[in-house]
């Protein structure tokens, strides 16, 4: 019996110039996704995925590291211009937005807050009593 040759397909990376950075800042974590203009995910990162555990995930420093990690992955695909869309009330929100502008070689084109606001929808959780 003849042996089959194993042929690996080469990974073809498309060069994408423009993209959108989605920053989801919750009270417990910060998630960052870089997409192209059509919404296809190119790179992503989160504070928990970088090794931050417990209450350290919700810190501004962890959010900054998550943004830098996601954008460095996206730069391999050729991203040069990004828009920023922020969602959520988390503590890492402001730092994450500032660190997008701090990454070398990436220009910020727009900024938009897409946090959903209820028009008197669900009842919020009761206050913590410690």
UniProtKB/Swiss-Prot annotation:
Q: Which GO terms describe its biological process?
A: translation
A single MF term (Gene Ontology): rRNA binding
For whether the record's keyword set contains Nucleotide-binding, the answer is: no
Keyword rRNA-binding recorded: yes
GO CC term, one of those recorded:
ribosome
Superkingdom of this protein's organism: Bacteria
Q: Which UniProt keywords apply?
A: Ribonucleoprotein, Ribosomal protein, RNA-binding, rRNA-binding
SUPFAM superfamilies membership: Translational machinery components (SSF53137)
Q: How does it assemble?
A: Part of the 30S ribosomal subunit. Interacts with proteins S7 and S18. Binds to IF-3.
NCBIfam families, per this entry?
A: PRK05309.1 (NF003698), uS11_bact (TIGR03632)
Its job: Located on the platform of the 30S subunit, it bridges several disparate RNA helices of the 16S rRNA. Forms part of the Shine-Dalgarno cleft in the 70S ribosome.
Q: Which family does it belong to?
A: Belongs to the universal ribosomal protein uS11 family.
In Swiss-Prot or TrEMBL terms, this protein is called Small ribosomal subunit protein uS11
